[in-house]
Amino acid sequence: MSEWDAYADQWDDDELVIHYSQQAYQSLTQAINCDGLTILDFGCGTGRLTELLHPQAKRIVAVDSSAKMIGVLAAKNLPKTEPLAIDLNSSNSQPMRNTFDLIVASSVCAFLPDYQASLAMFRQLLKPQGYFVQWDWLKQAGESTPGFTAEEIQAAFDQCLFKTISLQQAFTMQQGEDEVPVIMGIAQKRNQTGGFL
């Protein structure tokens, strides 16, 4: 059972979740034409971003480790969408290698036990020249809150053989009295020698 199961029933009604997914979608579609793409929505939750993307996509595989979150998404019966309750890793993801034009991870990567290992897996799942896009809380150097500095994301992209296309603050979220910035990283798969596959 995932720790996120407890949030599933109320997740779609959370104003922060709704606003975050809308802002993520808007920033994504301003940067990448999603028409006709095969997309992996990694850590999809109840599928707020999947719902926004599915009219444009050729196909979406929406994965989350929370079976209850996936249950909420599955009940929406979105066309061209395959919801999977799975803790995706380098072993069980092998059948998906070279499958996706685009992988999105919205407010997920900062909570992964091994961010770089997940990036390496994403690279294997992408088609040649495929894109990976993440949104996470932007933190400053030395902060211990969940999130990343731009330098941390850049270093991970480099280490995992991605070319950084864009790395910038995409939007902010109101949390109490604070405006919390969200960083968006866009990277493209490249081959072992630095060129594009």
Language-model segment annotations:
Residues 46-91:
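Class I SAM-dependent methyltransferase SAM/SAH-binding core
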Residues 130-137:
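Conserved beta-strand signature within the Rossmann-like core of class I S-adenosyl-L-methionine
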Residues 146-161:
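Short alpha-helix
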Residues 174-197:
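Core SAM-dependent methyltransferase catalytic element
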Residues 117-128:
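A short glycine-rich, Lys/Arg-flanked "PGG" loop and its adjoining helix->strand segment in the class I
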Residues 93-103:
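A short acidic, Gly/Pro-enriched loop at the edge of an enzyme's catalytic core
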Residues 102-114:
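A short SAM/SAH-binding and catalytic strip from SAM-dependent methyltransferases
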Residues 1-34, 72, 140:
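Conserved class I S-adenosyl-L-methionine
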